[in-house]
Curated annotation (Swiss-Prot):
Disulfide bonds join C179-C357, C210-C271. SMART domains: PTX. PANTHER family: PENTRAXIN-RELATED PROTEIN PTX3 (PTHR46943:SF1). InterPro entries: ConA-like_dom_sf (IPR013320), Pentaxin_CS (IPR030476), Pentraxin-related (IPR001759), PTX3 (IPR042837). This is Pentraxin-related protein PTX3. The lineage of its organism: Eukaryota, Metazoa, Chordata, Craniata, Vertebrata. Glycans are attached at N220. Homooctamer; disulfide-linked. Binds to C1q. Plays a role in the regulation of innate resistance to pathogens, inflammatory reactions, possibly clearance of self-components and female fertility. It comes from Mus musculus (Mouse). One of its GO terms (biological process) is ovarian cumulus expansion.
Amino acid sequence: MHLPAILLCALWSAVVAETSDDYELMYVNLDNEIDNGLHPTEDPTPCDCRQEHSEWDKLFIMLENSQMREGMLLQATDDVLRGELQRLRAELGRLAGGMARPCAAGGPADARLVRALEPLLQESRDASLRLARLEDAEARRPEATVPGLGAVLEELRRTRADLSAVQSWVARHWLPAGCETAIFFPMRSKKIFGSVHPVRPMKLESFSTCIWVKATDVLNKTILFSYGTKWNPYEIQLYLSSQSLVLVVGGKENKLAADTVVSLGRWSHLCGTWSSEQGSMSLWANGELVATTVEMAKSHSVPEGGLLQIGQEKNGCCVGGGFDESLAFSGRITGFNIWDRVLSEEEIRASGGVESCHIRGNVVGWGVTEIQAHGGAQYVS
């Protein structure tokens, strides 16, 4: 595109011509030089071509020349612009034709593409609509679900309260190791106890004893079971002292204690063993060995003919002695057994296992040996 350059050059030439101080005018014969068949009859009068023009003549000549140049400039500009416009029109025509042919050729392909994309566009619109619905539902959910959530929480609180009540009832009535019955001692009383009648004589040089206990209260000495004769009321005693377990054989001086093995209100499986051969003695709580010693009532023999009781001790049983209320047991007892030998570790653990209440001692067997409840003691299941 040279149009701006041409216009600039033309305008610059006109300005230079108009502002020039000196004009060298040359006379031009403007008569028509075409031969029209007429010939002059006389010679033309000679003129002085070098006649100097007046100021007015110079001015008119300058104006005439300026108008001529302006006309020429306008004509040239018009020609240039017309040519440029024609060239641009032709170029645009070629471009339009070139673009029309590919578009016409690609029309069916574009139509097929649009038809293929229409399902995708529809699915996109549907997905956007579903997302908007979900967002709207999520925004309204707290208001809609708070009442329902409150009802659920209230139901959970009631269920928890009911569950606590059931657990409390089960804790009061549940019996361990599959035992079906227990002896309940409602309070400490010198009249409340159980008398045991062994199936075999209590003449022992070794023994093992196990018992399930759930105590409601424990003092300095709370008897679980005791065996005594008229000469020695302390032949065998298993009792609680606060949270400790104590086993006595042959007298008060021969005792073994294990500290912190019993919890009030919870079932505990307690065992004790003794052998006269080395005076070995051991205590077990819930299947674990908690205390052991030797040289306890070594070479001693437990005589027969005494009284075996649970939940109480009879001081001087055969010479008019009585029961001591402060030694009485309160709570529940079940699974009381005595063997005339020392059980192995496996046997002791098995005697406190699940459904172990069918394991019975050969001297006293729970559910087989007669145990009479006295005072307010009673069997419960």
